[in-house]
Amino acid sequence: VIDEITPHVDPHKVMITFTGGEALVRKDIEACGRELNKREYPWGIVSNGLLLNRTRLDSLLAAGMHSITISLDGVEEAHNWLRGNRRSFEGAVNAIAMLAEEKEIVWDVVTCVNQKNFKDLMLLKDFLIELGVKNWRIFTIFPVGRAAETPELQIDDTQFTWILKFIRHCRAEGKIHASFACEGFLGNYEGEVRDQIFHCNAGISTASVLIDGSISGCPSIRANFHQGNIYKDSFVDVWNNGFKEYRNREWARKGQCADCDM
């Protein structure tokens, strides 16, 4: 796929991210990274940090890794509950502590808010600041798979509003740059809780190749919106001629949005 798209793009302007699941269970991430680096593509990973020790981090950096995101979903009890592993919190914190010492890599921490960690967000904020975290993204959990069947993973409307106000407070305070995730239009909170006005880039400027080869705008989007599969379709052809549901927004031009130029 990379060699197919290379004649059509400026590699310096295309970011490749390995996510999961857990990216670091792959032993060949560095080999893939070196090939991307050879072709001058910046690349990064999203990780739970459990497998990220000093040796592995040095190996990733030597392979040209530009960015990394670490998931930390609350203080120890809440994080380990969500991850289902009593060592997860320790692994994530150790990974964050290592990254705080690095000067050349772009990195941040993401937190998925749920009923188990909601009450500890203020405490978690202070803990992240103490660890040296500068950038913190806060997500809610999309209700699919296990999340749709586990009430503790969902927050209510009042809690959601509190989170937006909390992020706004963090940004005004200036001790850590907090942002809400990319999902959803936020009404009057737009422009206050993240760095840009909401616009979903799935199928517009981003695409995903999933574990089975499916071509999607984003891993969070349902399978019935997949556009093809790299094992039987040309990625460039799919990109140039597919994604019509993503790019044609006429269905949204109604009511107060009828005359929108976006």
Regions inferred by a protein language model and the residue ranges of each:
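Hydrophobic pocket-lining residues within nucleotide cofactor-binding pockets
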Residues: 23, 50-52, 113, 141, ...
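Short, solvent-exposed turn/loop segments enriched in Gly/Ser/Thr/Pro and often Arg
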Residues: 21, 181, 262
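Radical SAM enzyme [4Fe-4S]-AdoMet core and its adjacent flexible, acidic
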Residues: 58, 62-216, 220-226
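Membrane-interface junctions of multi-pass transporters
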Residues: 194-197, 221-262
